[in-house]
């Protein structure tokens, strides 16, 4: 059943709002239902006022707009001008949906890498601890293991509060949420109450949007100044994380996590072991320790598990409970997913690594697992940070024995141009194999691999599409790799 509320409760200072009852707040005119208030604010390319006719035709009972109106666009009688409307949307949506984030334990996770893994592992841990958990992030929104894709790492502000209201109504007790730098910069999480704010790391990404690392870091830091944050879990092995920790407001509980034994750490991992069966370490909190043995692969998954441990510690779980549940957590789709490795086949790993730091971490982690060659397949997205393309080439050439460059969501950009940008970063580009057809590149990489080799397919992870010229074509790295491995097995059987 849809909610309804007098608009005056959301805009008590606006006289024109007194006699209107609304059933929803909507920014996209195509999503308006009868009884909704249509919210028109300035976008990156066009003002929402340009879509008033569509919103009214679909049954909008109120038009709220942020002045000034763009030149040449007429404002209909009865439309309500609200100065600073965008900045008020979070509080309005929070109130309209009955303050949903205050009814659940809310954990917001920000950082360049590790957000999705941390969020999904935390929700899985809560689930195993008997907590009805939910997530919001790159993989979608929903109760644990019931995700619905949204197309955003962090949904737009009105959609986000609606999602949180639905999660509350569905019985969620705790929500783990990815909070992107774009979301923080654009006010998408305004009005959300966070119990725990989490920082994973800060490395190069999204500089096409933020301009430089300083502004990128400033956007991430906004999460920790958010209303009502009770605790902050911060990776103090990261220099920016250390700055965050020491800059926290008084009254915020500080939980530093470290794999390097940092003196500011409250939660640490010691005595690490890595092999093809997974990872192991001692979880140390204060003077106490407990063993963790996990089937997850990769050194960076120690960081992810340690971050989850920090959150659970901040929520007052005991060391014994934390260590036990960490040992039960399973891999996440598209994050260091292992395929093959049996009957003389190479091991194939599918991972979402699409930044220089993430690619470097994955390759470095796999190098400790491999006894043969390390073969890397990667590309770079179109219409995104061009500066990282050559950097990823440097990382791949330095850490892999064989490199294949391919397409990875070229979008509206020329794929040959993207490849040229990548190749510019190689010292010996003549040794790099280029195959823009991603399926063919995956097949070629697996085809040249032998038993003992590891093939990394990097960049897309969980994604089930290849975006070319505005069209998302069905594509899944895991499915392609499994088909190639199955064909290899069939050939061996015939022989």
Swiss-Prot record:
Q: Which GO terms describe its cellular component?
A: cytoplasm
| Record keywords, A-Z | ATP-binding, Cell cycle, Cell division, Cell shape, Cell wall biogenesis/degradation, Cytoplasm, Ligase, Magnesium, Nucleotide-binding, Peptidoglycan synthesis
Query: Does this entry carry the keyword Transcription?
Result: no
Reading the lineage from the top rank, the first entry is: Bacteria
Residues with the modification N6-carboxylysine, per the entry, are 220
Give its localization.
Cytoplasm
Q: What is its EC number?
A: 6.3.2.13
Q: Which residues bind meso-2,6-diaminopimelate?
A: 384, 408-411, 459, 463
Q: Where does the signal peptide begin and end?
A: none
List of residues binding ATP: 111-117
| Pathway the protein acts in | Cell wall biogenesis; peptidoglycan biosynthesis
Q: Which cofactor does it need?
A: Mg(2+)
Molecular function terms, GO-annotated? ATP binding; magnesium ion binding; UDP-N-acetylmuramoylalanyl-D-glutamate-2,6-diaminopimelate ligase activity
Instruction: Report the residue ranges where the short sequence motif Meso-diaminopimelate recognition motif is annotated in this entry.
Output: 408-411
Post-translation changes: Carboxylation is probably crucial for Mg(2+) binding and, consequently, for the gamma-phosphate positioning of ATP.
HAMAP family documented for this protein: MurE
State its role: Catalyzes the addition of meso-diaminopimelic acid to the nucleotide precursor UDP-N-acetylmuramoyl-L-alanyl-D-glutamate (UMAG) in the biosynthesis of bacterial cell-wall peptidoglycan.
Family that this chain belongs to: Belongs to the MurCDEF family. MurE subfamily.
Protein known as:
UDP-N-acetylmuramoyl-L-alanyl-D-glutamate--2,6-diaminopimelate ligase
Gene from which this protein is expressed: murE
């Amino acid at each position: 059943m849809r909610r309804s509320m007098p608009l005056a409760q959301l805009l008590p200072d606006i006289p024109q709002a007194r006699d209107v009852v609304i059933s929803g707040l909507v920014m996209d005119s195509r999503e308006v239902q009868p009884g909704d208030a249509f919210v028109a604010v300035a976008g990156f390319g066009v003002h929402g006022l340009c879509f008033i006719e569509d919103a009214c035709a679909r049954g909008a009972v109120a038009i709220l707009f942020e002045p000034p109106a763009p030149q040449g666009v007429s404002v209909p009688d009865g439309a309500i001008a609200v100065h600073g409307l965008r900045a008020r949307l979070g509080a309005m949506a929070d109130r309209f949906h009955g303050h949903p984030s205050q009814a659940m334990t809310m954990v917001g996770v920000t950082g360049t890498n590790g957000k999705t893994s941390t969020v999904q592992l935390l929700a899985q841990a809560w689930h195993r601890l008997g907590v009805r958990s939910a997530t919001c992030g790159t993989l979608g929104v929903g109760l644990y293991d019931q995700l619905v894709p949204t197309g955003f790492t962090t949904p737009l502000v009105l959609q986000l509060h609606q999602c949180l209201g639905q999660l509350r109504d569905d019985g969620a007790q705790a929500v783990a949420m990815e909070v992107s730098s774009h979301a923080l910069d654009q006010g998408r999480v305004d009005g959300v109450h966070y119990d725990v704010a989490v920082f994973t790391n800060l490395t190069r990404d999204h500089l096409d949007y933020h301009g430089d690392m300083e502004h990128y870091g400033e956007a991430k830091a906004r999460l920790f100044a958010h209303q009502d944050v009770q605790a902050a879990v911060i990776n103090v092995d990261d220099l920016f994380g250390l700055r965050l920790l020491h800059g926290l407001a008084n009254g915020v509980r500080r939980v530093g996590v470290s794999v390097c034994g940092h003196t500011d750490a409250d939660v640490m991992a010691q005595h690490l072991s890595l092999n093809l069966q997974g990872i192991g370490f001692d979880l140390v909190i204060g003077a106490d320790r407990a063993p963790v043995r996990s089937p997850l692969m990769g050194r960076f998954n120690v960081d992810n598990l340690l971050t989850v441990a920090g959150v659970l510690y901040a929520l007052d779980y005991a060391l014994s409970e934390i260590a036990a549940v960490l040992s039960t957590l399973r891999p996440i789709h598209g994050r260091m997913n292992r395929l093959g490795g049996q009957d003389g086949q190479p091991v194939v790993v599918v991972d979402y690594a699409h930044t220089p730091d993430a690619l470097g971490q994955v390759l470095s982690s796999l190098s400790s697992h491999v006894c043969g060659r390390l073969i890397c397949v990667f590309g770079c997205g179109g219409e995104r940070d061009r500066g990282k393309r050559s950097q990823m080439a440097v990382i791949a050439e330095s850490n892999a024995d064989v490199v294949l460059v391919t397409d990875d969501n070229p979008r509206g950009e020329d794929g040959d141009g993207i490849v040229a940008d990548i190749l510019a970063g190689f010292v010996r580009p003549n040794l790099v194999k280029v195959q823009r057809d991603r399926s063919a590149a995956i097949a070629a990489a697996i085809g040249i691999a032998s038993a003992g080799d590891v093939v990394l397919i990097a960049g897309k992870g969980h994604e089930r599409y290849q975006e070319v010229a505005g069209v998302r074509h069905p594509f899944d790295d895991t499915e392609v790799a499994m088909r190639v491995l199955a064909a290899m097995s069939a050939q061996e059987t015939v022989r």
